[in-house]
């Protein structure tokens, strides 16, 4: 059976160096406080995890294509919203505080990870997907900017995206997850654009003069 074209990228990263690169990419979405990098890293992680799944487990090519389409559309919505939003996002603390937070989270995860497993996934795949989801949770908790909030929400859906493709490949669950990703991105993009709407100017009160003060009509 010929390999899916989506699996080519997964074949390149299906090794220790590739997995380490993905761990660092997920962490950088929190450390580098920039909405462009948040969107870029989020879409890259969704595409690469889908490709890894295609290379290691060979799901239906149509399922992988729907995952790619959903990730690209969601990323495009967030990117366009960030481009039209002139208000800069204030960083949530400095990078050292965020690094310490990620380090604490990593230590806690290493303590509990041997007891956590996902169906049909190896321990390395489980660790990677859960780490991506945890980085999304940190990004979501630190950000009050809609674009970065959307990136965090999309990262949180990475484990669900993979499980839907493996556990129910023919049920359309992966398509539903993709639709949910697009709706999340659309909601965050709409919120970002709504923040730029000018406030409605108050209408001046209508003053009515008493009958005694009204000017007499001119004949």
In which residue ranges do the predicted regions lie?
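Alpha-helical transmembrane segments of multi-pass membrane proteins predominantly involved
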Residues: 1-219
């Amino acid at each position: 059976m010929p390999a899916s074209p989506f699996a080519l990228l997964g074949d390149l990263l299906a090794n220790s160096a590739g997995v380490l690169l993905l761990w660092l990419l997920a962490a950088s979405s929190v450390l580098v406080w920039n909405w462009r990098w948040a969107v870029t890293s989020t879409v890259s992680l969704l595409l690469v995890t889908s490709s890894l799944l295609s290379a290691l487990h060979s799901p239906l090519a149509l399922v992988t294509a729907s995952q790619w389409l959903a990730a690209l559309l969601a990323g495009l919505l967030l990117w366009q919203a960030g481009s039209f939003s002139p208000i800069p996002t204030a960083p949530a603390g400095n990078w050292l505080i965020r690094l310490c937070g990620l380090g604490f989270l990593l230590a806690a995860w290493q303590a509990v990870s041997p007891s956590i497993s996902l169906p049909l996934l190896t321990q390395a795949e489980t660790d990677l997907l859960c780490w991506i989801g945890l980085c999304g949770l940190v990004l979501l908790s630190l950000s009050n900017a809609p674009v970065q909030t959307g990136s965090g929400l999309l990262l949180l859906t990475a484990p669900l995206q993979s499980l839907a493709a493996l556990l129910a490949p023919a049920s359309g669950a992966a398509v539903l997850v993709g639709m949910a990703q697009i709706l999340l991105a659309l909601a965050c993009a709409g919120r970002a654009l709504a923040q730029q709407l000018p406030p409605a100017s108050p209408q001046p009160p209508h003053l009515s003069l008493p009958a005694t003060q009204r000017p007499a009509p001119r004949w």
